[in-house]
Each structure stands twice: as structure tokens, then as C-alpha cells.
Amino acid sequence: IQQMELLEDRYVTNLPGKVTFGVSSQHYTFTENAFVELVKRFGQERYAFYYNETGTHQILDDVKNRVCDLGILYLSHENEIVMRKVIEENHLVFTELFSAKPHVFLQKDHPLASKKVVSVHDLAPYPRLNFVQGEYESVYFSEELFSSIPVDKEIRVNDRGAIVNFMLGLNAYTISSGIFPKYLNGENIISVPLAENETMHIGYVLNENQELSELGKSYLEELRKYAPDNP
């Protein structure tokens, strides 16, 4: 569709070509924020940008089929062997941007909110929130660390806004990178470090032999600003 629009611009409407760029990402707030900054910098009078928050396997498909320019996901000790194999089989390449220690997202009045560190055992009484992965509901494609640990209460969602509502209304939690700007939900959502020994290696996937465009390089610059060691 995007290619058809570009051809129409060139040969039918005789207008200047649109600036184009696309990203498929796991459900991270910071990837969306970085995309906003990219559009502010490079969005001219005419552009066609694409931002898709989706499941892990769909990200790989989008990059492989060139639906988007690059994909954002994480590797960990838990999923790395299988994920690297799948990435290689799809003729893709993963490059790390930065690493982050896992945190638990909770609402500010949650019974665990005052703890300096939370363990998986502490979380057992509360509903766990996981993003839906469609037909690829496997620990290796999960967006949440430790999703292989059985729990009594679990809610699967496909919308980041729903996750926030369930945190606020049900004392539910999710496990992610801890990168969550406060202005997105006031002071209502907080992140608490998880005691478990694991690291999220957040990075991007490209097709083999694909060179980053200037927009791609600029987007990665924006993403790096959210690295946990940045002030």
C-alpha cells in the first residue's frame, strides 16, 4: 500500500514524495515516545510513518517482509537461544541498544508499592498481566520475563492502555524494563526493581545486509536516550 501511494505521488498527483519510515515494536512506552520525537524532527508537509505495537513473532514477520524498517524487542537468558535461532532462520540480525534490569509495574497504592525490591514470590497473590502473542503463546516469545512461572491469576491483553487500567483497578502487575516516564500516568504507576537475577537486552532487528536509513539512525538515537544509565 505504501509503495502504491509513493507511485501515485510521483506519477499522478505530481506532489513531492512523502517521507516514509516504519517501526514494529513490543509494547514499550519509550519506543512510542522516541517515534514521536522522530516525527517532530523529520515530519515535513507530507509523510507516511508507520508505528505498530504488536507481538514478538509479528515483529519478525514485519521486518522480514519489509512492512517496517526495523523492529524493537528484547533478548534475555530465558529466551535468547530460541530467539536467536528464529531470528537467524528469518535472515534477520539483532543488535543490542542497551540493557535493563527487570522491574515490576504497580499502581502507587499497591500493597507492594512501598518495598524497595520485589520477588516473584511476593507477586504470587496478585494478577499477572501478559501481552497476547496470538498463535505464538510461548515463553520464548513472551514480552514479560518469568512468564513460564505458573500463577493462579493471569490476564492476557493486547493493549497497553488496558494494562494500566487493570493495574489501577485490580492491583495487577506486569514485569518489564522499568522505563516508564511518570508524566504518562501522573504518579499513579510506579516501577519497583525485581529481585531475580535476569537482564533484558533491548535492541533492534534488521534484514541481513540491510543498511539503516538516516531516519533509522535518528530513531535509534532517540531510543538510546531512554537507556537506564542516562540521567
Identify the role of each PLM range:
Residues 89-95, 100, 161-211:
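Beta-alpha-beta core module
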Residues 16-82:
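Central regulatory/effector-binding core of bacterial HTH transcription factors
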Residues 34, 211-223:
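Short amphipathic alpha-helical coupling segments at ligand-binding clamshell hinges
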Residues 64-67, 133-190:
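Hydrophobic hinge/microswitch elements
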